């Protein structure tokens, strides 16, 4: 399957992420389940979590964590 490219991310309350993809879809992803994994433990700091950015189609944080854009697309809920 060819996935649309992630273009924008906005952190929301309760570790949710608002996502915008290149096909115009707006989706929401609940990041909370990932926070139990050691790799994402630092992101329990909500201020750090809110500093999420998009780099070349995937989300990342300055502390080195990133997340697969295909998983974001498949596991998120469409809003439009």
Positions of PLM-derived features:
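Motif-centric detector for short Cys/His coordination patterns
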Residues: 1-80
């Amino acid at each position: 399957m060819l996935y649309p490219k992630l273009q924008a991310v906005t952190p929301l309350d309760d570790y949710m992420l608002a996502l915008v993809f290149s096909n115009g879809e707006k989706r929401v992803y609940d990041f909370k389940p990932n926070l139990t994994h050691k790799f994402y433990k630092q992101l329990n700091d909500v201020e750090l979590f809110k500093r999420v950015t998009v780099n070349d189609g995937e989300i990342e944080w300055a502390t080195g964590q990133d997340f697969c854009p295909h998983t974001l697309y498949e596991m998120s809920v469409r809003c439009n």
